[in-house]
Amino acid sequence: MKKSFAVALMSVLLCASVWAQTKAVGASVAASAAPAVVAPGSIQDQNILSVKPDADLEPGYAAQSNGERAKVQPGNNAPMWRQVGSGLTGYSSLPTPEAGNLIQAAVQYPGATKTTAGEAWRQVRNSRIIPYGAALLLIVVVAIALFYWRKGSLPLHGAETGRRIERFTAFERSAHWTNAIAFCTLAISGLVMAFGKFFLLPVLGATLFGFLTYLLKTAHNFAGPLFAVSLVVVILTFVKDNLPRGEDLAWLARGGGLFSGKEVASHRFNAGEKLLFWGGVFVLGLIVVGSGLLLDKLLPGLLYERATMQVSHMVHAAAAMLMMAMFLGHIYMGTIGMQGAYKAMRTGYVDETWAKEHHE
């Protein structure tokens, strides 16, 4: 009796289990077959391969928002990036200027195509300032070398008398050498930062070159303010004797006697030195100083945005290249290019014969 009851109970349980499993499978199949309810604005198809190739021909395709584009081309976020690239300002908790702008708006700097400002700055630097600046400096160096090869150091025509005349005071020489040392520091460090990857990086390797450029960049930033202060001192010290005079035109017309071999009368500074003072020291010097102080963020009250820094860098680099080209000639004439010139700035005195021949 008990055995028959147990067999009957097991049969009932087995039938119930089979019925439950059959119902669950049926419900699962029905659920998978039922169409999914798509929320408004959501992606209707995740398979980008199923997108028709003519989706861009739909009316209003170009004006679609990112949500609308996701319906016809899942994964195509062009509308969002188009807004970002147009200079759209988003939200950021950072207090810095332009923190909400991921990409700058399109501009067209001289020498660059119309594109985002960051890319336009890169184009100007890499395709204009670097190659043309290098060509300018190379041309000047080659011209100086050829001139020295043909002319050598310009000698005195008469014998020295031994009588010395003061040409520069101690203060004038101190101002000059302070400015000159700061300028050379800036020029060398600037040239390495601009061109070093072309001729130093392959030799030194990435690690040593990176360490060197870091040191030179630090030296550049510290020498900049020193150059700015000493430049103002130099301008105020020598401006009086660099004012234009009547004999300057005659000096320029005869090329300073550089090719004829005959000296041309001039005041304390000849027309060539005055051109260097007004063009190289005053105009280019102040441009380099102003843009450099802005790049170092040392000018109070300014909003240091990316566009401001980009324009300042381009102006700074271009003016510095021109300034270095001019001062290469000045350094040459003040050292090996003319007999007695370096001694004048080192000791402050020149021989009487030198004074008569060069500055009557």
Could you tell me what each predicted segment is?
Residues 2-5, 20-360:
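Membrane-embedded alpha-helical bundles that constitute the cytochrome b-like, heme-associated redox core
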Residues 7-16:
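Bacterial N-terminal signal peptides
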